[in-house]
């Protein structure tokens, strides 16, 4: 009985650290997935609103720049019939871009260049490899806008998450 107990105890002593390590790895991957999906859904919600105007707005509701790694969205948030540019804090434009493996945003964005962009992801924890918005136009229908994002954990680069989400641009 003592020998059997010793064998079981040694087996458990070997198994427990591996179980804890796998549990920690799974928890980190889930946290990374949650973070990336939250960002993808946020961008997609803005894309879905792009072009909305309760009046006669001028300009394009959506501007996809470069390879889709920067987008500028306009929509009439206060339904006053125009796309407000001033004051910047209440501007109807918002931009998202990938710069140096960080997703950034700027309220009142007019181009994808310049300073003043706020980091949306933490560069000390997450490396964004890919951020891309793709527009697919289908004759007779509203365009389909797809947000693609690929990210890795900075502490564990082998932990990678891919996310892709599509919305319809009804106002475009």
Which sequence ranges carry the predicted segments?
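Aliphatic-rich helix starts adjacent to a transmembrane/signal segment
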Residues: 1-48
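Short, hydrophobic secondary-structure boundary micro-motifs
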Residues: 8, 55-56
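Type IV pilin-like appendage domain
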Residues: 60-138
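Generic detector of ordered secondary-structure context
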Residues: 34-35, 88, 159
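Short linear sequence signals and composition-biased patches located at protein termini or domain-edge surfaces
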Residues: 114-172
